[in-house]
């Protein structure tokens, strides 16, 4: 790996709009054939390794989940040289092991979104790809995320099924009950089509889900407030710089 290569790219979700301890930061405005990404890509040094960061919802959280240009985000990260992408996704917990302030590295997902451009095989003349998506997150990269958590002492649930919903509204109790029956442990709004697009581009991709609240009808869930969400994300994210730094080592 050359000194100028990107060791790791991180996509930040709700409540994670910058990467703590990222030094010597350079800002890159990237154009792609699919339009502009959510915002500039910040590239800097984290614990001795070159790491890129992109805020999925834009700076100031200006983009709701269904308006994110997922294709441009993935293409932009690839264009700057990233080959490994760690996606930070703020989610709700459905099953008992996934309560607020839990970090999880899911191994499966179910897509409930609609109307989003979900492939790079869209324009006339583009190569048609039927990518294998049985394991939607890179198994080898997931194992490295889990190992990095152990090394840095970050408590992490290894596994779980992420259910991706359309948003931006939260789900009904009945919708969450259906998702539980389907086998979902977590619910979020940005897991797809991001994971599938990364697979089409040949990127190693894993999700680190930050549980901000109980989903509707689960746990001791009451009315969910944004203040509660951000507080729980902040608490659960305290060990992320060390985990990400360890992951960037290779």
Curated annotation (Swiss-Prot):
Signal peptide annotation: none
Record's keyword terms, sorted: Glycosyltransferase, Purine salvage, Transferase
EC number: 2.4.2.44
GO biological process: L-methionine salvage from methylthioadenosine; purine ribonucleoside salvage
EC class: transferase
Record InterPro entries: MTAP, Nucleoside_phosphorylase_d, Nucleoside_phosphorylase_sf, Purine_phosphorylase-2_CS
Annotated positions for site Important for substrate specificity: 171, 226
KW Transferase (keyword) present: yes
HAMAP family from the UniProt entry: MTAP (MF_01963)
Functional note: Catalyzes the reversible phosphorylation of S-methyl-5'-thioinosine (MTI) to hypoxanthine and 5-methylthioribose-1-phosphate. Involved in the breakdown of S-methyl-5'-thioadenosine (MTA), a major by-product of polyamine biosynthesis. Catabolism of (MTA) occurs via deamination to MTI and phosphorolysis to hypoxanthine.
Name of the protein in its database record: Probable S-methyl-5'-thioinosine phosphorylase
Taxonomic lineage from the root: Bacteria, Pseudomonadati, Pseudomonadota, Gammaproteobacteria, Lysobacterales
């Amino acid at each position: 790996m050359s000194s100028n290569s990107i060791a790791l790219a991180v996509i930040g979700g709700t409540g994670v709009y910058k990467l703590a301890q990222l030094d010597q930061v350079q800002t890159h405005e990237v154009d792609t054939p699919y339009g502009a990404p959510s915002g500039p890509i910040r590239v800097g040094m984290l614990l001795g390794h070159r790491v890129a960061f992109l805020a999925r919802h834009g700076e100031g959280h200006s983009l709701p989940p269904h308006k994110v240009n997922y294709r441009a985000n993935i293409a932009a990260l690839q264009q700057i040289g990233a080959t490994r992408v760690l996606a930070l996704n703020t989610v709700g917990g459905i099953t008992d092991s996934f309560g607020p302030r839990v970090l999880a590295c899911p191994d499966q997902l179910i897509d409930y979104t609609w109307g989003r451009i979900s492939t790079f095989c869209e324009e006339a003349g583009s190569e048609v790809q039927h990518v294998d998506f049985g394991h939607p997150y890179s198994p080898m990269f997931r194992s490295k995320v889990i190992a990095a958590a152990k090394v840095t002492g970050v408590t992490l649930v290894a596994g779980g099924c992420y259910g991706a919903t359309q948003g931006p509204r939260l789900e009904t109790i009945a919708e969450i009950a259906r998702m539980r029956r389907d086998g979902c442990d977590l619910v979020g709004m940005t897991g797809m089509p991001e994971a599938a697009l990364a697979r089409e581009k040949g990127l190693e991709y894993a999700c680190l889900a930050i549980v901000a609240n109980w989903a509707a009808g689960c746990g001791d869930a009451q009315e969910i407030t944004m203040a509660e969400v951000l507080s729980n994300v902040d608490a659960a994210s305290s060990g992320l710089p060390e985990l990400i730094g360890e992951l960037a080592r290779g």
